[in-house]
């Protein structure tokens, strides 16, 4: 890693932002270089935690981030075993990980972070140490990877664990705890800079049950009756459609901003149109409803 916790990292969407962030970096220090790399959008992030002995992998765990790559791994929601990875993606991750372990002659714990789009994978970084997801995957697998890694580093003979991550009949979710409500002027939007102040691990029969347990454990609450939907591209609207139908089926009152409201109506989903602050004189206003606590949950 170049930095810890994503400190001093920024994502630029245009040339103007790039110039501004480079100027900020120069103001801090003109003597040190700035690392610039391409930001891959809408990619899935994958964690590969493993223990190797003299370059041979003895045990491993592959987990997937629920959020797109670009959210710091300390803030991301992680599920293990992976539920939505292509078989070919898993095969490539295992192959590349074996090659890296062999090339670096790794003897102990290590973590590799990958990005995947379709079946193309890219290595974000390889850390020759245990990661924050090591304790989580160890508990889910019921294999103490740190104990195994310690014995390997001390030269104590060990046997290769026989348990396979695809043999598990349950799903684990690692969710992050945030303290935005207690921090004045905190920005609750997640990004490359780590913001979480803790985390929980939960097990369930499937992703949905484990995820619900984890969200409740970190202080989230189930919306009672009103949900505001506001999506961007046509692709995002299409991806949200089935979920919106499910919410309506369960009796939730749906509010939506302009384009989202039209899309829902065209697909037979009843909703109430709300307006942005820029649309003066029109009601109901989205921000007013939020300030008056008339909305229980926002999906944006």
Regions found by a protein language model. Name each.
Residues 207-213, 231-235, 254-256, 275-285:
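A general structural motif
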Residues 266-300:
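Glycine-rich, anion-gripping cofactor-binding loops and their flanking helix/strand elements
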Residues 116-128, 236-243, 266-267:
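Short glycine/threonine-rich loop-to-helix capping motif typified by GTGT followed
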Residues 3-4, 67-69, 260-263, 279-282:
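Short gly/pro/ser/thr-enriched loop/turn and capping motifs at secondary-structure boundaries
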Residues 220, 224-226, 231-252:
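Glycine- and Gly-Pro-enriched alpha-helical subdomains that act as flexible
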Residues 36, 227, 298:
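Receiver (REC) domain switch-region micro-motif
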Residues 228, 251-264:
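Short internal beta-strands
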Residues 1-223:
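ATP-dependent carboxylate activation and anion-phosphoryl transfer catalytic cores
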């Amino acid at each position: 890693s170049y930095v810890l916790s994503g400190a001093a990292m920024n994502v630029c969407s245009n040339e103007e932002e790039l110039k501004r962030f480079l100027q900020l970096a120069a103001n801090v220090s003109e003597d040190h270089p700035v690392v610039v790399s391409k930001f891959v959008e809408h990619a899935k992030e994958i964690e590969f935690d493993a223990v190797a002995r003299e370059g041979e992998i003895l045990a491993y765990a592959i987990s997937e981030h629920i959020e797109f790559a670009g959210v710091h791994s300390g803030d991301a929601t992680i599920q293990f075993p992976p539920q939505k990875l292509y078989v070919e993606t898993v095969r490539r991750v295992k192959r590349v990980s074996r090659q890296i372990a062999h090339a670096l002659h790794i003897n102990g714990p290590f973590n590799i972070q990958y990005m995947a789009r379709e079946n193309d994978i890219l290595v974000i970084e390889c850390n020759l140490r245990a990661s924050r997801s090591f304790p989580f995957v160890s508990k889910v697998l019921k294999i103490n990877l740190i104990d195994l890694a310690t014995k390997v580093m001390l030269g104590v003979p060990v046997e290769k664990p026989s348990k396979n991550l695809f043999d598990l009949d349950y799903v684990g979710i690692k969710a992050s705890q945030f303290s935005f409500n207690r921090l004045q002027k905190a920005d609750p939007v997640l990004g490359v800079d780590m913001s979480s102040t803790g985390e929980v691990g939960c097990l369930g029969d499937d992703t949905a049950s484990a995820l619900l347990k984890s969200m409740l454990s970190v202080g989230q609450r189930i919306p009672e009756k009103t949900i505001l939907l506001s999506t961007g591209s046509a692709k995002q609207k299409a991806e949200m459609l089935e979920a919106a139908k499910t919410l309506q089926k369960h009796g939730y009152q749906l509010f939506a901003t302009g384009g989202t409201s039209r899309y829902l109506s065209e697909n037979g989903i009843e909703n109430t149109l709300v307006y942005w602050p820029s649309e003066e004189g029109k009601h109901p206003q989205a921000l007013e409803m939020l300030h008056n606590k008339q909305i229980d949950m926002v999906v944006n």
